Design a protein with these regions (language model features):
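Bacterial N-terminal signal peptides that target proteins for export
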Residues: 6-32
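Cationic-aromatic interfacial patches
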Residues: 47-119, 123-126
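Surface-exposed, glycine-biased beta-strand/turn segments
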Residues: 127-238
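Short, well-structured beta-strand-loop connectors
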Residues: 216-227, 259-277
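Zn2+-dependent peptidoglycan hydrolase active-site motif and core
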Residues: 220-261, 286, 291-292
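Extended, charge-rich intrinsically disordered regulatory tails
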Residues: 272-284, 290-310
Length: 310
C-alpha cells in the first residue's frame, strides 16, 4: 500500500432588397446595390461553436473531454474551457479541432458543472452532470518507522513541478497499457484510516499493482521521462520513482520501484521497460503505485485503459 497523495442552427434567410436601377447609369446602380447590401452581409449570423463533451454523464474520478471544432484556423490559440474558477488550455488534436481535459476527483461534490467554452469570439455555457461514486474505505496500520515519514522539501518541489507540467504535443495514441502484470490490490479513489485516524483530505491517487518484487514495470503509453527520483536523493514517500509526461497535461508517475531503467529526457514507447517493482519509500510491501494526473489532479486511469479519450 502507499500513503501517497469534459446545433448548429443553419438558418437561411432570403433577404429581399429592392434597389432602383436606372438604365441611364448602370455604374451608379451597381454602387447603390453595394452600399445597401453591405450592412446585410456584415449582419450575417455567426456559426455556433461545435462542442462535444465525453463522457456525457461522467462520474467523480473521470476525465471530462471537451472537443471544440472551429471554422477559422486563426482562432485556434484562443480556445479555452473554464470550470468554476479554473481555466484549462485547449490543445490541437486535429486540423481545426481543439480539446481541453477537465479532471474530477473524489474530494469534489457530484452535481451540475457549468463549462464555459470560448472560441472564435463566441462563448457557450454547457451543463454537465457529474455523478456520485462510492469509494471504498481501507484501514491501514503502518509499521513503526513508516507512520511518521514525511516528504522532504526537495521531494515535494519535484513532485509539484511534475504535476504542473504542460506540453502542447500529444505523445500518447490509443488506450493505455497496464504498467505491470500483477493483480490490482488497491483501486483509485479509496479513502483511508491510517493507524485509526481518518484522513479526510486523502484519497488513493492511483492504482496499486501487487506485482512480485523485481517484476517489470513498463510505460503505459508514449511520453518523455521528466522525473527520476531516488531514496538517496530524499524521496522518502515516493521511494524510487519515475514520472512520464504524455503531453497536453497528461502524466503518469510510478512509485516504490526497486530499480530504474530510464533517465530524465528519455523518450519511451508503450510497453518499454522503465523499472521494477519494489517497496522503497512509504510502502508496506512490494507493489507498484501508478498515479495518473490530468492538469495537475489525480484521476482514475481505468477509463484511459478501456477506451481512447476523445
Amino acid at each position: 500500500m502507499t500513503t501517497e497523495y469534459y446545433a448548429r442552427t443553419c438558418g437561411k434567410k432570403l433577404l429581399g432588397l429592392v434597389v432602383p436601377v436606372f438604365k441611364t447609369n448602370v455604374r451608379a446602380s451597381s454602387v447603390l446595390l453595394g452600399i445597401f447590401a453591405l450592412p446585410f452581409a456584415l449582419a450575417a449570423p455567426a456559426k455556433a461553436l461545435q462542442v462535444e463533451v465525453n463522457p456525457a454523464t461522467p462520474q467523480l474520478g473521470d476525465t471530462i473531454s471537451v472537443v471544440v471544432s472551429l471554422d477559422n484556423p486563426a482562432n485556434g490559440s484562443n480556445v479555452t474551457v473554464t470550470n468554476g474558477d479554473q481555466t484549462y488550455p485547449a490543445y490541437e488534436i486535429a486540423p481545426l479541432q481543439y480539446r481541453a481535459l477537465i479532471p474530477t476527483t473524489p474530494l469534489e461534490k457530484a452535481g451540475t458543472r457549468t463549462l464555459r467554452v470560448a472560441g472564435e469570439g463566441q462563448v457557450q455555457n454547457l451543463s454537465v452532470q457529474v455523478r456520485q461514486r462510492k469509494f471504498p474505505v481501507q484501514r491501514i496500520n503502518l509499521p513503526p518507522g513508516k507512520a511518521g515519514v514525511e516528504a522532504t522539501e526537495y521531494e515535494l518541489k519535484r513532485a509539484a513541478e511534475f504535476k504542473a507540467l504542460q506540453t502542447p504535443e500529444k505523445f500518447w495514441d490509443g488506450p493505455f497499457l497496464a504498467p505491470n502484470k500483477g493483480r490490482v490490490s488497491t483501486i483509485y479513489g479509496v479513502r483511508r484510516y491510517y493507524n485509526g485516524k481518518f484522513a479526510d483530505d486523502y484519497y488513493h491517487r492511483g492504482i496499486d499493482y501487487a506485482g512480485a518484487a523485481g517484476s517489470p514495470v513498463v510505460a503505459p503509453a508514449a511520453g518523455r521521462v521528466v522525473l527520476v527520483g531516488k531514496v538517496s536523493q530524499g524521496f522518502r514517500i515516493h521511494g524510487n520513482v519515475v514520472g512520464i509526461d504524455h503531453g497536453q497535461g497528461v502524466a503518469s508517475i510510478f512509485m516504490h520501484l526497486s530499480r530504474i531503467n530510464v533517465k530524465e529526457g528519455d523518450f519511451v514507447k508503450p510497453g518499454q521497460l522503465i523499472g521494477a517493482v519494489g517497496s522503497t519509500g512509504a510502502a508496506t510491501g512490494p507493489h507498484l503505485h501508478w498515479g495518473f494526473y490530468v492538469n495537475g489532479k489525480s484521476v482514475d486511469p481505468v477509463p484511459w485503459r478501456n477506451q481512447v479519450v476523445k
